[in-house]
């Protein structure tokens, strides 16, 4: 399946769609294009599936320190994004979870909301594997993908697959992980930066870093094919 993932809201909190939850969005811009809607139209035209990136962490929203209020805010966002106005959504890529303890995000509410509106949507949370009670979500070396062991704990639960950008998983990736004593099958989705040394966006300070060469991308892809 071919799909694209569009950023709906990054850590800065700016919403790239026509939202009624905040004025920190495209409606307050001179260019009021609903970016998510335009990408959805292009996907439909070219036969490509649509996925969404959404940052849990928000450096702008005033209610962010209040876990309950902020969870309501996120649910309102995800309801708008998943209610069908943008068509079928095949993946939700959640990021920024390291900024609060795991329980603060109320991932069960997020997961249930998305699955109710888009039952086939697959949900992943960055830095999925680790101890659930980690204060910041920052793991030790044990929980880097190359070190994953069968039955390691799932930190970000519930979710459908594992993320840990931009790290590679081991070739004999076990895929079986646990939460509250129950085992779950969770494949790994690989993400690769356009430039080497963990550079996701264009910035002058990264301009001299080499681009990821195609041979390395192909090599990584072939490793993932075996897992």
PLM regions and their residue ranges:
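Mature catalytic domains of secreted/periplasmic carbohydrate-active enzymes
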Residues: 1-227
